[in-house]
């Protein structure tokens, strides 16, 4: 069984009005994400991991330093799919609604405090990595991870993510990562996706 790259949940040009160009997706989805999937299939071919769910490959390979290459490509395959779903071209960003809004109010003390925590995590992740909104033992938290690592290996439930590898923003925002973060929070966050993940947790 081969791992597959899921289609983007929107047209590659759909986020142009919100600061993310089709050119970015041409490279980010079409080259970077595709390469992680291809590498994962090469590394797991003819092994028991080829038939495991992707999440299982991630958690199992994380435990074995000899499988770091498999982990990196499996996690990046999953992380990118989750990131695309964390974006929406219609009605994204701004203050959330529904259950996630109430949970943010109770666990962070309001949306503005969540926003500052998320901006800080994303901006201070040194080098490549990810910022996450997760559910950890029933409580919402903001976390950041380096390189390919994700909250699954810590037993946390991811609700949203932002990719802060340079290739995620350099074509559109150059070296201005804080502007990329602000734009994500203001215009692109898919709160409906976060609500779905919270409901399923």
Positions of PLM-derived features:
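Feature for soluble, non-membrane regions of globular proteins
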Residues: 1-201
């Amino acid at each position: 069984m081969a791992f597959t790259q899921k289609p983007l949940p929107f047209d590659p040009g759909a986020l142009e009005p919100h600061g993310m160009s089709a050119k970015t997706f041409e490279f980010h989805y079409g080259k970077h994400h595709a390469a992680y999937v291809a590498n994962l299939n090469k590394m797991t071919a003819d092994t028991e991991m080829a038939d495991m769910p992707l999440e299982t490959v991630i958690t199992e390979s994380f435990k074995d330093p000899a499988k770091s290459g498999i982990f990196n490509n499996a996690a990046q395959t999953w992380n990118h799919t989750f990131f695309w779903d964390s974006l929406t071209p219609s009605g994204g960003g701004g203050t959330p609604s529904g259950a996630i809004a109430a949970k943010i109010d109770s666990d962070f003390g309001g949306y503005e405090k969540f926003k500052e925590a998320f901006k800080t995590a994303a901006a201070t992740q040194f080098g490549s990595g990810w910022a996450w909104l997760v559910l950890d033992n029933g409580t919402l938290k903001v976390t950041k991870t380096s390189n390919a690592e994700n909250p699954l290996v810590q037993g946390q439930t991811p609700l949203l993510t932002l990719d802060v590898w340079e290739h995620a923003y350099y074509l559109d925002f150059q070296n201005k990562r804080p502007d990329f973060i602000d734009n994500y929070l203001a215009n692109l966050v898919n709160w409906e996706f976060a609500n779905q993940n919270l409901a399923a947790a």
